[in-house]
Amino acid sequence: MMRRIFAIISALAIAVTATACGSTEPRSLVRSVDSGHVILGTKYDQPGLGMRNPDKTMTGLDVEVATYVVNHIADQRGVAHPEITWRETPSATRETVIKNGEVDMIAGTYSINASRAKSVNFGGPYLLTHQALLVRSDDHTLQSLQDLDKGRKLCSVTGSTPAQKVKKSLPGVQLQEYDSYSSCVEALHQKKVDAMTTDATILYGFALQYPGEFEVIEMTKEDGKPFTNEHYGLGLAKDDAESTEAINDAVRAMQDDGSFQAMVDKNLGENASVVEADEAGNLDFVKE
């Protein structure tokens, strides 16, 4: 009897261990589409890009892009549009949740760079934007990037790259990192920091959400070109070539049929000019 009980306990332990191990393996977007259910990561606090509303619905450009992509993949594979579960994915956690198999794909202002591309695959890019500053409208001492190089306090989000680029260029900046963009905006409102930096797409969304309180300052180099180019991609499991190509096909279709521009106009409104369609599958800009 005791042997039988021990055998049952051992079998259960093995099953639990196998399940736990399986949960840490990357997912396949294509397989999940075929199964009828996908888990998509995005931001919950970015006006115009990724927002979770009080009624728990999701809105924003990245939300619409991700939805179009998975539905297009389903159409191409002859299956029904999948049920979508949304998951909040802050900048600092994105590579981890992909590698652990917690999401199928992330669409969340996910700039493609060499460091991230070592850990995950990227579909796209689907959008090109640039870095900018958000300042208080009543602070007239900050009119350009160079004005920060006087011991001013600059806020950005942990796991995001823009502030590090500014710090490298302007050593006099005092860099402060917060866990979310909304926390950065609140710190700026309370005058705990002097400016916030990230992509122009994100900053214009916050400026619209708080009319009259903030303004966006463009960041340029001495030659007048943007301080950075930010290419947004769709993150997924490393080496998942099938899903990556399926995403790229969907992005091309989205741009060709006019859906992408319609999404941009709808979600970014008068600030639609801060983005342009990017070339899916072209990662030549990624440098070590």
Q: Each predicted region: which residue ranges?
A:
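C-terminal motif of bacterial Sec signal peptides marking the signal peptidase cleavage site
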Residues: 16-20
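Extended ligand-binding regions for polar small-molecule ligands
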Residues: 22, 63, 67-72, 139, ...
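Ligand-binding clefts/hinges and TM-proximal coupling segments of bilobed small-molecule sensing domains
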Residues: 23, 162-175, 215-218, 246-288
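Extracytoplasmic small-molecule ligand-binding "clamshell" domains
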Residues: 28-105
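Periplasmic-binding protein-like
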Residues: 44, 127-135, 208-248, 270-288
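Bilobed "Venus flytrap"/periplasmic-binding protein-like clamshell domains
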Residues: 45-47, 58-75, 131-186, 200-202
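Acidic, polar ligand-binding/catalytic clefts
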Residues: 79-147
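A ligand-binding cleft/hinge motif common to bilobed small-molecule-binding domains
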Residues: 92-93, 108-119, 165-168, 194-228
